[in-house]
A protein has these predicted regions:
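Beta-propeller folds
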Residues: 18-256
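Sec-dependent N-terminal signal peptides
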Residues: 2-12
C-alpha cells in the first residue's frame, strides 16, 4: 500500500507537466500542428484588381482546400471552387492543390498537384483541368507516369494546355482528347522546355517555354549538354554513408 501511494504521488507531477501548455515539448513541436505556419496563397489577381483568389482550408472536408474570392473594396468572401468539386472520379479525397491557374476566359482552372522536387523546387507533378461550367475534372497527359509533368500552362485563347514531359514538349486540347508531341529528341543530354542543373542553380532558370499571344506558336529553350564534364557533389545527410551525385557542370574554358 505504501509503495502504491508513493508511485501515485510520483506520477501526479508528470501528468500535470504533460498538460501544462506553457511547457514547450518535442511532442508539441514535431508531432502536432500547433506551431504549423499559416500560409497565404497562392493568390491570383482578377481583372482590373476587383478581387483576388486564394486557397483556404475547407469547412466541409477535413483534408480539402477551397479556392475563394475576396472583393478588394468590400472584403466580401465567396467560395468559387469548393473541395467537393476537386474529387476525381473513383477517388474519395480532393486534390491537394500546390498551385493553380485560371484560363484567360475564366472557363477552366488548371491545378498543379502531387508534386516532386527537382533539385531545389517542386516543379514536377500532375496537372488537372477543371471545367468551371460542367465541373468535370480531366487529368492532363493521362498516359504519363505520375508526377512527370512540368510547367503546364493554358494557351492565351484557353483552348489548349502545353507542358514539359520527360524533357519534351506536348500540347493537348482542354478535354484531353488530342495530344500532340512537339519535340521528340528530349532524352539524356538533350533538354527541351526546361533547364539543366547549372542554369537553375546559378541563374534561377527553370520554366523554359512560352505561348505566342495568338496561341499558334510556342518558343522554348533547347539544351544540348553533350561534352560537359561531370562534377560530383557529396550527399552526407540522406543515408548512413555518403552518396555521390553526378552533375554536368561547365568550368571556365570548358564546353558550355
Amino acid at each position: 500500500k505504501h509503495l502504491l501511494l508513493v508511485l501515485c504521488f510520483c506520477l501526479f507531477p508528470l501528468s500535470t507537466l504533460a498538460q501544462d501548455h506553457s511547457l514547450l515539448t518535442v511532442e508539441r513541436i514535431f508531432n502536432s500542428d500547433e506551431f504549423a505556419e499559416r500560409k497565404f496563397g497562392p493568390a491570383r489577381w482578377l481583372e482590373k484588381g476587383a478581387g483576388y483568389t486564394t486557397l483556404e482550408p475547407s469547412n466541409t472536408i477535413e483534408t480539402g482546400t477551397d479556392i475563394v474570392r475576396y472583393d478588394t473594396r468590400s472584403g466580401k468572401r465567396k467560395v468559387l471552387v469548393s473541395a467537393e468539386k476537386l474529387i476525381p472520379d473513383g477517388l474519395k479525397n480532393p486534390l491537394d492543390i500546390d498551385n493553380y491557374e485560371w484560363s484567360h476566359d475564366k472557363k477552366n482552372l488548371l491545378i498543379f498537384t502531387n508534386t516532386k522536387k527537382v533539385w531545389r523546387y517542386h516543379t514536377r507533378g500532375d496537372y488537372w483541368v477543371l471545367n468551371l461550367q460542367t465541373w468535370k475534372l480531366n487529368k492532363v497527359g493521362r498516359a504519363a507516369k505520375p508526377s512527370t509533368l512540368m510547367f503546364a500552362k493554358f494557351a492565351p485563347d484557353g483552348s489548349m494546355v502545353a507542358y514539359v514531359r520527360e524533357q519534351n514538349i506536348y500540347v493537348e486540347d482542354i478535354a484531353g482528347t488530342k495530344i500532340v508531341q512537339l519535340t521528340s529528341d528530349g532524352l539524356g543530354n538533350i533538354i527541351n522546355g526546361t533547364s539543366d542543373w547549372v542554369y537553375e542553380e546559378e541563374f534561377g532558370l527553370r520554366n523554359g517555354f512560352r505561348w505566342s499571344p495568338d496561341s499558334r506558336h510556342i518558343a522554348y529553350w533547347h539544351f544540348d549538354t553533350n561534352g560537359i564534364k561531370t562534377f560530383y557533389m557529396i550527399n552526407n545527410t540522406d543515408s548512413l554513408y555518403p552518396q555521390l551525385i553526378p552533375l554536368q557542370y561547365p568550368k571556365v574554358g570548358t564546353i558550355n
